[in-house]
Amino acid sequence: MKIGIVCYPTFGGSGVVATELGMALADKGHEVHFITYNQPVKLDFISHNLHFHEVLIEEYPLFQYQPYELALSTKMVDVVEKHQLEVLHVHYAIPHAYAAFMAKQMLKEKGIHIKVVTTLHGTDITLVGSHPTYKTAVEFSINNSDVVTAVSRNLKDTTNRLFTIKKEIDVIYNFIDVDKYEHAHKEECKLIALAKLDERILTHVSNFRPVKRTEDVIRIFNQVQQEIPSKLLMVGDGPERAKTEQLVRELEISDKVIFLGNSNEVAKILCYSDVFLLPSVTESFGLAALEAMAASTAVISTNTGGLPEVNIHGKTGFLSDLGDVNDMAKNAISILKDDETLLQFKQNAKEHTKQFALKNILPFYEAIYKSCILKV
């Protein structure tokens, strides 16, 4: 099949999933074309059947904000025509689903009938898409897609609650390449560079946006380190990083918290970890938690959004109410204080991720592409 993938080219979950999906499809022999404004950060090679098309936005002084949707839809038309694509798979509803609809209409005028698959990832629905400024356009775009998928049952239910959706939403969970985490563990974990041998390692990975509540991460860790010798690795970057670093200084734990910034080596970093902290306001799925579990790391998270579908309470980690820092710290300590308990949680976490392996999820997307291409 010839597939166009439209996504944000960033470290965010939707961009990572879209990029890894495209690379996996190319590995299986499909022809894949990424259409976005920068080369996706996870796209580290181009091949005969894996392509990148940059969306260029011309600056024009009349516009306060440059019209990316127009440039994107025009590029979609160009790539579909030139490479005879059969389906456009757009990740994140805003603005990709709307741009895809415009492209579809323009192509229809040329006698070309492209199919559009829209995958909803979370904040495109819960935080942005439901805003009155965008809601009507997002609802329209979803209803005019040929197929709509969501990354969790919770996100499907939320979408149906917030919008008037006239078509079925298929749930296809996010996935991970479990082999990547196996390789990371086979390489030597240079733990000694980060912590003493008797210290536990806690980790947080995110884009440091307010929804991730990174200050809660610090407060949880502060309680843990008072009970158990430990270090905290903070991976990622974003608007809340400065405030988070300031809180670390105020609590006088700068010697125990390491800020690593953005990284393409998350699998290797997670191989050091014992517990992963994710106290988010909401997670449509919780890809960061799943990645941690694949690296045999127990998860302490909130019980919001799709997280209960990923993190099994009392088995792979624990779930707590939003903002309940004390409960999350207590749960983390209960896992970390005993070697046998920690090992059991780590083994459970690793085992649970097998159902989310790329090889198990990829066929669902292939089936959707085939069915919508065949549908007249």
Segments the model singles out, each with a brief description of its role:
Residues C7-F11, M23-Y68:
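N-terminal strand-loop element at the rim of the active site
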Residues N154, F175:
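Carbohydrate-associated surface elements
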Residues Y181-K196, F364:
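A short helix/loop element that forms part of the nucleotide-sugar donor recognition site in Leloir-type
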Residues A195-K212, I218-F221:
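Conserved donor-binding/catalytic core segment of Leloir-type glycosyltransferases
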Residues N262, V281:
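Aromatic "clamp/platform" in nucleotide-sugar-dependent glycosyltransferases that forms part
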Residues A298-S301, N311:
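Short hydrophobic beta-strand element within catalytic cores of glycosyltransferases
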Residues H313-G314, F318-V325, S334-D339:
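Conserved acidic donor-binding segment of nucleotide-sugar-dependent glycosyltransferases
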Residues D327, S334, T341-Q355, A367:
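A short, well-ordered alpha-helix in the C-terminal region of glycosyltransferases
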